[in-house]
Regions:
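A short, polar/charged loop-to-alpha-helix boundary motif
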Residues: 43, 414-417
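Internal maturation/activation junctions in enzymes
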Residues: 188, 192, 200, 251-410
């Protein structure tokens, strides 16, 4: 899987971010990998205000967070893999040296050529026919597509592993030597210099201080089936909330895809999404998400009681705090309803449009406006806010040995439900 992921530059590029759930057969547990990028230390509200921006840009160097995919791949391989980095990256290096471009990717590049032309390095690699007189600038389907700089970087990682092996390092240490070269060595120096030359903010210290986080996943049992999701830095727990709500209904009796069945699914997701948009955020920052209450079966029962035969457009976030023995610190923002319901008493920051993979996101899943409502603050990198990831990965334990893995694309429409 890791070797395949290393070749998927169209959707899992090395400048992007990675999330994963891993089943550990010996320990018989699910492990969560958080390789989400963080905003660079210079990406403060004051900085964007000084540029006359109300929002961080959608594209380009100022939109970039620290790359998480390289670190995520290397840590997963070091901690839980068996192959060497050289073995894993061999197919990726071969493809970077040149391969026949597939039609789908060729079409995607051509469709985005105007955007790619804004950035000289992107245009040089992705638009090899940029000086041609005809309209087409990107590679043709079947044309040999080469990325020599990427191949050179991948070879540097393999070289770092080989040098560490010669020094007598363990398998894990050799792979982490490649990690250090990317985030603290010559690759980091070159990366930061290139970003800054184009007006970006990522520094060498930003890269050096970034870490992959190995976490405990969130978990519920749905009718005896264990379901695992990543934490509230993704929207994954909203699926767990929806399943808890649906457990209060006899879906089988409704009939698969009947009007009542679809209505009930929609309403369960509507309720869980309302909680997601209000309560979810970066777990590294206060206030702590009321995740125990949100995933409580009793809270789900109270939310399920709100589902009626017709859609209720007034549905808002509920109050999960009593279901974990706490009081809600946001009562000034919500008006208490009945049965665990609550309605917004004032508008929150507007929800953001679907972001591209390189767009920084606020931890609550909305893009904050950069105006007087935002504090002027700059975090040390260890505390930097991470982007809110709208894609999500599931591991579903059907029984003692049977597993299902469900993944949906980024975008926030349906979290693998």
């Amino acid at each position: 899987m890791i070797a395949a992921t290393s070749t998927m530059w169209d959707v899992l590029h090395w400048g992007g971010e990675t999330q994963a759930l891993i089943w550990h057969p010996k320990e018989r547990r699910v492990i969560a990998i958080n390789a989400l990028g963080v905003a660079p230390s210079g990406a403060t509200a004051e900085f964007f205000k000084s540029k006359g921006m109300k929002y961080p840009p959608e594209f380009g160097p100022l939109a970039a967070v620290t790359p998480g995919t390289p670190g995520g791949i290397l840590v997963m391989l070091a901690e839980y893999g068996r192959l060497s980095l050289g073995e894993v990256l061999a197919p990726a290096i071969e493809l970077a040296d040149g391969y026949p471009m597939e039609a789908q990717t060729a079409t995607l590049i051509e469709r985005n050529k105007r955007k790619l032309k804004e950035w000289p390095d992107s245009a040089r690699v992705m638009l090899p026919h940029g000086s041609a007189n005809d309209d087409r600038k990107g590679p043709q389907a079947g044309e040999i597509f080469r990325q020599p700089e990427l191949a050179a970087t991948l070879r540097k990682l393999v070289e770092a592993e080989a040098r560490a092996l010669k020094r007598g390092a363990s398998r894990k240490q050799t792979i982490m030597a490649a990690y250090d070269r990317f985030y603290r060595g010559d690759i980091a120096t070159e990366f930061a210099a290139a970003v800054q030359a184009q007006g970006g903010l990522i520094t060498r210290d930003d890269l050096a201080n970034w870490r992959v986080k190995i976490e405990e996943p969130r978990h519920v049992s749905y009718r005896g089936v264990d379901v695992y999701k990543l934490d509230t830095w993704t929207q994954g727990p909203s699926m767990l909330q929806a399943l808890n709500i649906l457990e209060n209904f006899d879906l089988q009796a409704m009939g698969y895809n009947s009007a009542r069945y679809l209505h009930t699914l929609y309403q369960a997701m509507n309720l869980s999404f309302a909680d997601r948009d209000f309560y979810y955020g970066d777990p590294a920052f206060a206030p702590a998400e009321p995740i125990t209450g949100l995933l409580s079966k009793d809270y789900a029962k109270a939310r399920a009681a709100q589902i009626r035969d017709r859609n209720d457009p007034r549905i808002g976030p509920g109050d999960p705090y009593p279901f974990q023995g706490d009081s809600n610190p946001f009562k000034d923002l919500i008006g208490a309803g009945q049965g665990g319901s609550a309605m917004p008493a004032m508008p929150a920051v507007p929800a953001a449009p679907v972001p591209p993979n390189d767009r920084p996101y606020s931890p609550s899943g909305v893009v904050p406006t950069v105006d007087s409502r935002l504090p002027d603050r700059s975090y040390p990198l260890d505390d930097a806010e991470q982007a809110f990831w709208r894609g999500t990965t599931s591991v579903i334990a059907a029984d003692a040995e049977g597993w299902l893995v469900s993944v949906t694309p980024s975008g926030g429409w349906i979290p693998a439900v």
